[in-house]
């Protein structure tokens, strides 16, 4: 068992990463259904929460079926982070997470996300501001450092633990790498070998198969893994990893029927959450991901992108299923 404060997770939990415009309630619900043990919201601007910005407030939506769930906030101002932690607490998530890892320029330029990696003292102050403003367990997601010459994750891990966080997720790249090159998990291993580290350490970066998950779990001895991009359009990865850990065998790849069911559930939940029209418009970014590598889907993609009602959507699902059934690929 792995504990984050008072939150109990199974041995070697699998976490869904907080991903902007992806990790919303419908997607989290689907990942929970397919084996994710702990999920995080899309990251939320502390300044946006304080301004009561509609987009930021909408990201606070959480539901009992997805627990345990954490809400992730980011910012570079101590007072704003403190106030936003108090706002987050009002919706009663299980965890408050701080983003010190987002490498995107618009976030970094505000001195937030991975931008804070340049100033560990500020990182500690921001963390303490959140820890002291909530009774909920506080976790952090960060990177190895700003660039290869300033990797400071070993110092950061100790200082954030001392600041009161209950778990740390490390994306094993620097900010300058963005999402390029290979993640260097050796630093995660070094932190786990430090006898002064008592909090759970979760690894993140490049986990895209059950085989790699098992290899990295054995080689780097982390307490669990966070999965992000590999889950987009493929929520089955969580149960696939768990099954492989338990049996050493791979589950069959999802069939066309499995993929169509996942798309149906995702779209229905999206429509339920945001309204039929907007929910289906936001689904447009997901269709290609669910059918990545499936021959002839391009013929249906254009039609899916034009759907604006569930009635049209259901008709197109039936048409798609019939096409693949006739090709004996379902």
What are these regions (language model features)?
Residues 1-330:
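Flavin-dependent oxidoreductase catalytic cores
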């Amino acid at each position: 068992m792995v504990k984050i404060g008072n939150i109990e997770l199974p041995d070697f939990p699998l976490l869904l990463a907080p991903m902007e415009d992806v990790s919303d309630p419908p997607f989290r619900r689907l990942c929970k259904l397919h084996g994710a043990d702990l999920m995080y919201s899309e990251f939320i601007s502390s300044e946006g929460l304080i301004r009561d910005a509609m987009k930021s407030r909408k990201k606070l939506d959480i539901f009992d079926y997805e627990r345990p769930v954490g809400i992730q906030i980011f910012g570079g101002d101590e007072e704003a982070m403190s106030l936003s932690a108090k706002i987050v607490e009002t919706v009663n998530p299980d965890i408050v997470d701080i983003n010190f890892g987002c490498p995107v320029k618009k976030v970094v330029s505000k001195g937030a996300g991975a931008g804070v990696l340049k100033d560990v003292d500020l990182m500690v102050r921001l963390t303490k501001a959140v820890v002291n403003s909530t009774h909920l367990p506080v976790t952090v997601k960060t990177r190895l450092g700003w660039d290869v010459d300033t990797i400071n994750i070993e110092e950061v891990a100790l200082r954030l633990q001392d600041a009161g966080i209950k778990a740390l997720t490390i994306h094993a790249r620097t900010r300058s790498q963005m999402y390029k090159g290979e993640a260097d998990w050796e630093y995660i291993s070094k932190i786990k070998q430090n006898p002064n580290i008592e909090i759970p350490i979760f690894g993140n970066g490049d986990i895209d198969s059950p085989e790699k998950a098992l290899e990295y779990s054995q080689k780097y001895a982390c307490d669990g893994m966070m999965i992000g991009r590999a889950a987009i359009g493929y929520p089955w990865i969580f149960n696939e990893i768990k099954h492989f850990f338990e049996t050493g065998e791979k589950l069959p790849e999802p069939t066309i029927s499995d993929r169509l069911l996942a798309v149906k559930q995702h779209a229905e939940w999206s429509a339920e959450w945001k309204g039929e029209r907007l929910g289906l418009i936001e689904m447009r970014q997901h269709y290609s991901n669910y059918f990545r590598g499936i021959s002839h889907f391009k013929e249906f993609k254009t039609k899916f992108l034009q759907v604006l009602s569930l009635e049209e959507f259901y008709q197109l699902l039936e048409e798609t299923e019939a096409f693949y059934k006739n090709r004996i690929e379902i």
